[in-house]
Amino acid sequence: MKIFAPIVKLNIGRVFFSLTTNLDWTLQHMNVKNTFLNGNLEEEVYINLLLIFDKESKDGKVCKLRKSLYGLKQSPHAWFNRFAKSLHYQGYTQANLDHMLFYKHKNEKVTILTVYVDDIILTSNDKGERERLKEKLALEFKMKDLGSLHIFLEIEVARSREGISISQRKYVLDLLKETSMIGCKPANTPMDPNTKLSTKLAQGPMNKGRYNRLVGKLIYLSHTRSDIAFAISYVSQFMHPPLGEHMEAVHKILRDIKGTFGRSLFFRKTMGNNIEVYTNAD
């Protein structure tokens, strides 16, 4: 039984933003309705009958599924397989770097799209191909055309003449509310420069599940907040088992983002091919 379904890497999304900014391409957003009902099962799957079919159930009869359903382990894999086959049939190539990335290149015209479960981001310098693809997908699947991209995976996207900014303002506010730190005093930095965390039991162990969930959510936030990436990387080294001082360090990060929740990652439109490199090592 195959249950694996690839997930798009978020750094691919950042490449999308940089590419479309500098080439002046549009970013289109589409959503697939009832995603997992579109998959074709590769194996035979049977389910028990509903209670209304009491007589048939007593006779030992069961239902054979013709399509995938929500709740089946195979559903994500089955859905993605069907979606990928549809794109291959329309002349799209699946990228080796990221299997959720598809592209079509013909006569200097390029169309690129990526998919995350039921969300599709599409960009192109070929309006005709872009609209044709939308029509083809809408014929095969129930689709909702959301127009220009504004939000994707809780990442807010804003575009201007100067470039594209991505942020997670609502995500930050929800995280602060969840941790009851919406009213906390903001910190000036995510971590003190001389912070040295230890694994020695000094303040007692913390709730491992809560600590790991918080760090996981902060890791996701770091995709648009590179300024807190180092601090998050450091506290993520103490997942087994977390201690009191480790949770205090996490709270310090939360206090920092309380005062900076409006920050965003900006992709500026640039001219030329000058490459700038920054490093903190030789």
How should these model regions be labeled?
Residues 1-282:
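Long, low-complexity, charge-biased intrinsically disordered regions
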